[in-house]
């Protein structure tokens, strides 16, 4: 069995790490590079950086901090934000990122997934999916431009349909951002994860809702995800990554040292 991955997520806006609740009301957490270094030293398996307003602002992620991060950490990291072409992705990978993640641009142009997978290999291409549970319809719906409250909108895609579509087009990994749980810290949406897991054949990363160590264990044991992504519990030092891995080992879950 492959070891499960623990992945801190750093939302970036205006060159700083920020964190919101349910994708709103972001507060500044701190500078990018020291946080990245701290997480690498604590034992994170990889890091994910989202330039959260790049797509809605119509620009590509700022590459200057990508290079600075690459200099100070020795674990893989993934970068997302406004990547609309193979050229955009190439620049970010050249600056030191190991993977690129696309979300809103893939919804606007699904062919982009295939173009990137063909050029860089599926192992480099992550698709982020922002999924919102609509209580009225009882459906999980994919949302777009979630980095900017004023531009966030529902798409025509239901989550499981989009998961299947992006796999067909060459996604090497899927990060499922569960919007209703984001920043609330009351646990991952296990029901949704199981639903997506049933149609997802590539590595699946859970995102949104981690508040305690047992939430990570539940995602791994009850939904069989490959990795668990979290932000506020790490930023606010509610959970230490080294201690989390120790706890998971005690639960019989295989993690990397």
UniProtKB/Swiss-Prot annotation:
It is an enzyme of class 4 (lyase). CDD domains: HisF. Pathway: Amino-acid biosynthesis; L-histidine biosynthesis; L-histidine from 5-phospho-alpha-D-ribose 1-diphosphate: step 5/9. One of its GO terms (cellular component) is cytoplasm. One of its GO terms (biological process) is L-histidine biosynthetic process. InterPro entries: Aldolase_TIM (IPR013785), His_biosynth (IPR006062), HisF (IPR004651), IGPS_HisA/HisF (IPR050064), RibuloseP-bd_barrel (IPR011060). The active site is at 11, 130. GO terms for molecular function: imidazoleglycerol-phosphate synthase activity; lyase activity. Its main location: cytoplasm. The keyword Amino-acid biosynthesis applies. The keyword Secreted does not apply. It is found in: Cytoplasm. Keywords: Amino-acid biosynthesis, Cytoplasm, Histidine biosynthesis, Lyase. Its EC number is 4.3.2.10. Belongs to the HisA/HisF family. Heterodimer of HisH and HisF. This is Imidazole glycerol phosphate synthase subunit HisF. It comes from Vibrio cholerae serotype O1 (strain ATCC 39315 / El Tor Inaba N16961). The gene is hisF.
